[in-house]
């Protein structure tokens, strides 16, 4: 699929989102910072990417997801857990960054911070009913299908 990409910061021309391998699902997004950003434990920051996208097709959306290494090794995850980019959004991609770790983390300019994944979207239509057809699970919720 083709995705319209607008470069908002000239430095990003040489740092375009890219798939790390042929099997990668996510495009790496970088922190478009002028200087290093220090995040103390528990702090959050909204980090610019220097890029804007326009998916343009209501059958798709983009997700901003954390990079697994940053989360596991340093406790750096997304403040909103997942960023949903609707197909009609055209503004700069911003990364809500949260240091859930126990030590201070320094984010350097142009460091890979998150990943962008394009996903198909189906918009649902509601069918109002008085009752549901019986299923094996019924209304069983959290933990209702067993311990393991």
From Swiss-Prot:
One of its GO terms (biological process) is dUMP biosynthetic process. Its EC number is 3.6.1.23. Pfam families: dUTPase (PF00692). It comes from the Bacteria. Its cofactor is Mg(2+). Substrate binds at residues 67-69, 80, 84-86, 94. It catalyses: dUTP + H2O = dUMP + diphosphate + H(+). Pathway: Pyrimidine metabolism; dUMP biosynthesis; dUMP from dCTP (dUTP route): step 2/2. InterPro entries: dUTPase, dUTPase-like, dUTPase-like_sf, dUTPase_trimeric. Keywords: Hydrolase, Magnesium, Metal-binding, Nucleotide metabolism. GO terms for molecular function: dUTP diphosphatase activity; magnesium ion binding. This enzyme is involved in nucleotide metabolism: it produces dUMP, the immediate precursor of thymidine nucleotides and it decreases the intracellular concentration of dUTP so that uracil cannot be incorporated into DNA. Belongs to the dUTPase family. This is Deoxyuridine 5'-triphosphate nucleotidohydrolase.
